[in-house]
Amino acid sequence: MVRKIAIYGKGGIGKSTTTQNTVAAMAHFHDKKVFIHGCDPKADSTRLILHGKQQVTMMDTLREKGEDECTPDKVIEVGFGGVKCVESGGPEPGVGCAGRGVITAITLMEQHGVYEDDLDFVFFDVLGDVVCGGFAMPVRDGKADEIYVVASGEMMALYAANNICKGMVKYAEQSGVRLGGIICNSRNVDGELDLLQEFCDKIGTQLIHFVPRDNIVQKAEFQKKAVVDYDDTCNQALEYKELARKIIENENLVIPTPMTMDELEELTSKYGFLD
């Protein structure tokens, strides 16, 4: 049975990079059949898998050609490792609601039965926080079974992660969605690993993997490739291989217990953020 996973986190934390590198490792090292559904108006959730190809988005297709032309064969591309890719896209800048576009795109893909098409995993790469109903859809309506939050040892990254957990708690009972863990996309800040571990303990989940910072990620991006596509023998490729393995084998799925703002500030001040 296909597992549906949504990746959340603060804007700019590296969700799309982490998602694509993890998915590439799943396909390359673990022989998994994976589908990425980009849920960001920037439509950059699949560019490394597709070697920089600008994918036609579902919302552009709907606007320009209509729903009859917005079919899987017109909007899905296949990239590295046989990974299938689609981008929701969004409205024209300053017009309309991008969150509504996510709802429309996911619903259309479901109607076409795409997510059940002999897959092991579907990944929803979701924009930012869950303050908007459209971007909360994978949580609210049970479109995803598991949530992973990308964070770092920075105050605003933890603040966003905690807010995402609050959104999960609101909808977890009705949707059945659960938190699979926190992924640390390291920023090399002091005490980062210890801080993330303590944060995870307090919200009742696991630090599923600590991804170290490595310039090879940027080097691979310059070549428009995922790390495992660029060099599958390097240390960072093995980190993504390990993260992929942990997600594949993960059975520790929980409803989190978010911290209060006072508790979060107390935690971060312990590590010197509020000195």
Swiss-Prot record:
Cofactors required: [4Fe-4S] cluster
- According to the record, how does the cofactor bind? Binds 1 [4Fe-4S] cluster per dimer.
Please state the Enzyme Commission number of this protein.
Answer: 1.18.6.1
Keyword field contains Iron: yes
Q: What class of enzyme is it?
A: oxidoreductase
Query: Which transformation does this protein catalyse, written as a reaction?
Result: N2 + 8 reduced [2Fe-2S]-[ferredoxin] + 16 ATP + 16 H2O = H2 + 8 oxidized [2Fe-2S]-[ferredoxin] + 2 NH4(+) + 16 ADP + 16 phosphate + 6 H(+)
Post-translational modification here is noted as: The reversible ADP-ribosylation of Arg-100 inactivates the nitrogenase reductase and regulates nitrogenase activity.
Report keywords, A-Z.
Answer: 4Fe-4S, ADP-ribosylation, ATP-binding, Iron, Iron-sulfur, Metal-binding, Nitrogen fixation, Nucleotide-binding, Oxidoreductase
Residues annotated with ADP-ribosylarginine modification: R100
Gene Ontology molecular function = 4 iron, 4 sulfur cluster binding; ATP binding; metal ion binding; nitrogenase activity
Q: Which Pfam families match?
A: Fer4_NifH
GO biological process, alphabetically ordered: nitrogen fixation
NCBIfam families for the chain = nifH
Q: What family name appears in the similarity comment? A: Belongs to the NifH/BchL/ChlL family.
Specify the protein name: Nitrogenase iron protein
Q: Which organism is it from?
A: Methanococcus maripaludis (strain DSM 14266 / JCM 13030 / NBRC 101832 / S2 / LL)
Q: Write the lineage as a comma-separated list.
A: Archaea, Methanobacteriati, Methanobacteriota, Methanomada group, Methanococci
Corresponding gene? nifH
